[in-house]
């Protein structure tokens, strides 16, 4: 993995500052709370502005992506003041279609990469997938980690993989899923 070398510190995994009883008590309190009036609307606006509208089917077509982009651009037409969604999320092969359809809007184009949805591929393939999405115009990359390596306790491998993908993103934002 070329470029800036990041060092994984495994000691962070040995420190667990979570107090289980406190988490459970707060969870119960949150489930009983009711948000009312303008606070509820502010919350809904905030949620909408953070959502990615997504089409990630094997049968995606440029027409389907264009349709989703049109929906995203005009979602707020009937309710003045409603924010747009944060992004449209597509496969790397559909990034340029979404980018063109969203031109002139503030809506970002996100792309899954790194062998979505399984993450079961070599680092070389994951980096190529990421670079393709960025080259096609993706503003954000949704990365799937090597879950098998993570569950096997190979955290340094996963850390290095994330660092390499981040480097391949260039200026695009990386989101690890």
Which role does the model predict for each range below?
Residues 46-54, 86-90, 109-114, 141-143, ...:
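Hydrophobic faces of well-ordered beta-strands that scaffold small-molecule active sites
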Residues 1-49:
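Charged, compositionally biased N-terminal leader segments and the immediate start
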Residues 57-75, 79-113, 120-121:
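Conserved alpha/beta-domain cores
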Residues 34, 56, 70, 139-140:
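ATP-dependent carboxylate/acyl-activation modules
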Residues 30, 34, 50-62, 110-127, ...:
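Active-site mouth loops of central-metabolism enzymes
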Residues 18, 42, 59-67, 89, ...:
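Conserved active-site and cofactor/substrate-binding residues in soluble primary-metabolism enzymes
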Residues 92-115, 153-175:
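Alpha-helix-loop-beta-strand connector modules within alpha/beta enzyme cores
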Residues 125-177:
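Hydrophobic, well-structured mid-protein blocks that either form specific transmembrane helices
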């Amino acid at each position: 993995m070329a470029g800036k070398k990041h060092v994984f510190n495994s000691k962070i995994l040995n420190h667990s500052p979570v107090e289980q009883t406190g988490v459970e008590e707060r969870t119960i309190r949150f489930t009983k709370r009711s948000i009312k009036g303008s606070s509820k609307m502010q919350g809904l606006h905030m949620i909408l502005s953070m959502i990615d509208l997504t089409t990630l089917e094997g049968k995606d077509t440029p027409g389907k992506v264009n349709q989703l982009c049109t929906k995203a651009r005009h979602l707020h037409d009937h309710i003045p003041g409603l924010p747009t969604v944060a992004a449209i999320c597509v496969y790397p092969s559909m990034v340029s279609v979404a980018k063109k359809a969203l031109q002139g809007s503030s809506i970002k184009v996100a792309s899954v990469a790194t062998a979505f949805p399984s993450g079961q591929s070599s680092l070389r393939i994951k980096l190529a997938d990421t670079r393709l999405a960025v080259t096609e115009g993706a503003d954000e990359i949704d990365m799937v980690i090597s879950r098998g390596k993570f569950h096997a306790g190979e955290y340094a491998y996963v850390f290095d993989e994330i660092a390499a993908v981040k480097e391949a993103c260039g200026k695009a934002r990386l989101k690890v899923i």
